[in-house]
């Protein structure tokens, strides 16, 4: 079956982030449901993040021929599905360690390779990347909310009172038909994840109307070395700053769901809270040009740091719903504004520095820093519970003073 190329790309983003909207907010809850201790949950999530970093940094750049991008995406989707199914076959920490590494290793390169495909297609025909990419964020919002509902509800009810139409299905009857307690329990997380990745793979198997073409990329001999790049004070200040700001999310990513469950919130409410954070993120990304047209990377990092100290401090103080709503809205400051600052700083560098600096930023801020703090948070959560969010606020605090004082070089 042949479909429009932009539809193929949008479907890929939608199904990937639909899966990620199940995995990121609720995987710690699944591990807890399998009887894993908080300290081991932190280790497993940290190992997964390290594997994501390795997958993005090593696997993605190996696809140098743009015409091979779709084959690579199909293969990685298949491998991710195989490892997702692997979670069914055991809950011993050693087995989970192995499967977490494999799943994240092959799941993580899907977005950078999809972005590379988008860039290739933009050279072949004109389309609005933002309008295609936004379907990923919409999918995350839907799946995180829906997973919470399927975990906590007793069934599905649908009615239109004005037309006297009604329909309902009990989860007890569904579970009885399956022969296992899946719906309304933590088991739905894994089942839903496997289903979503299966749909992603099936979507990848469709044929886009326009296949990607291009010349194989060759190594740029003018690329600056890591040593040369890090010898500049503003660069290492930038990297330390963004790594601290993103690493401060580790407590939230790893234990936010469990913390809110222990505070008495239902999985459906928790799903809505996660969705709210992404909705705020989408709004800021959408209107970033209007909001921050004249902001420097240094000032954006200041705003992100202030939001981080406030957000994580509030999370350690209160679990009242109005406060949690404010906390989740602040996600657009702690994550989105920080990412916008990074893109502004990196985009203003010399051309031969951009690829290496982008890779270093992704490795440290979006991978390594969060991985290390996830492991630390796992050990700390057992002893100080909500105190880990105060620690996260302290992690973000030095970033206020480490912001690069000199603006990045221009092209």
Which residues make up each language-model segment?
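Juxtamembrane intracellular "pre-TM" segments in multi-pass secondary transporters
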Residues: 1-3, 177-179, 206-242
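Hydrophobic core of transmembrane alpha-helices in multi-pass small-molecule transporters
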Residues: 14, 83-84, 93-113, 243, ...
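Helix-loop boundary and gating motifs at the non-cytosolic
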Residues: 2-52, 235-273, 339
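C-terminal membrane-cytosol helix-exit motif in multi-pass small-molecule transporters
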Residues: 151, 155, 188-213, 399-407
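A late C-terminal transmembrane helix in Major Facilitator Superfamily
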Residues: 355-383
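Structural signature of the two symmetry-related core transmembrane helices
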Residues: 71-85, 299-314
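Helix-to-loop junctions at the C-terminal end of transmembrane segments
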Residues: 54-68, 151, 283-296, 381
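Intracellular juxtamembrane helix-capping segments at the cytosolic ends
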Residues: 27, 107-123, 336-350
């Amino acid at each position: 079956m042949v479909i429009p190329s932009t539809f193929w790309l949008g479907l890929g983003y939608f199904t990937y982030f639909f899966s990620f909207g199940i995995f990121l907010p609720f995987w710690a809850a699944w591990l807890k449901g399998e009887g894993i201790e908080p300290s081991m949950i932190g280790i497993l999530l940290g190992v997964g993040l390290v594997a994501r970093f390795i997958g993005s940094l090593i696997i993605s750049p190996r696809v140098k021929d743009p015409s091979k991008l779709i084959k690579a995406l199909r293969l990685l989707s298949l491998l991710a599905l195989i490892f997702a199914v692997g979670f069914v076959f055991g809950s011993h920490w050693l087995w989970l360690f192995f499967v977490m590494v494999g799943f994240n290793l092959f799941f993580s390169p899907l977005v950078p390779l999809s972005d590379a495909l988008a860039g290739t297609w933009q050279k072949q025909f004109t389309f609005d990347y933002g309008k295609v990419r936004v379907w990923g964020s919409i999918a995350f919002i839907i799946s995180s909310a829906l997973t919470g509902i399927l975990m906590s509800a007793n069934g599905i009810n649908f009615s239109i009172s004005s037309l006297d139409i009604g329909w309902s299905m009990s989860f007890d009857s569904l579970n009885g038909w399956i022969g296992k307690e899946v719906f309304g329990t933590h088991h739905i997380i894994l089942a839903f994840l496997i289903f979503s990745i299966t749909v992603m793979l099936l979507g990848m198997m469709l044929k886009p109307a326009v296949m990607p073409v291009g010349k194989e990329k060759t190594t740029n001999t003018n690329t600056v070395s890591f040593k040369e790049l890090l010898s500049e004070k503003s660069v290492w200040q930038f990297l330390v700053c963004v790594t601290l700001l993103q690493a401060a999310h580790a407590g939230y990513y790893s234990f936010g769901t469990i913390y809110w469950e222990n505070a008495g919130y239902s999985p459906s409410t928790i799903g809505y809270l996660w969705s709210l954070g992404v909705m705020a993120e989408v709004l800021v990304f959408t209107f970033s040009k209007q909001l921050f047209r004249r902001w420097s990377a240094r000032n954006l990092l200041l705003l992100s740091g202030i939001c981080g100290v406030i957000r994580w401090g509030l999370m350690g103080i209160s679990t009242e719903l109005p406060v949690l709503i404010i906390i989740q809205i602040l996600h657009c400051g702690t994550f989105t504004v920080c990412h916008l600052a990074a893109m502004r700083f990196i985009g203003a560098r010399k051309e031969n520095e951009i690829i290496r600096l982008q890779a270093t930023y992704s490795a440290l801020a979006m991978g390594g820093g969060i991985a290390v703090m996830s492991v630390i948070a796992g050990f700390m959560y057992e002893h100080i519970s909500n105190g880990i969010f105060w620690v996260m606020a302290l992690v973000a605090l030095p970033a206020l003073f480490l912001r690069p004082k000199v603006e990045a070089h221009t092209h």
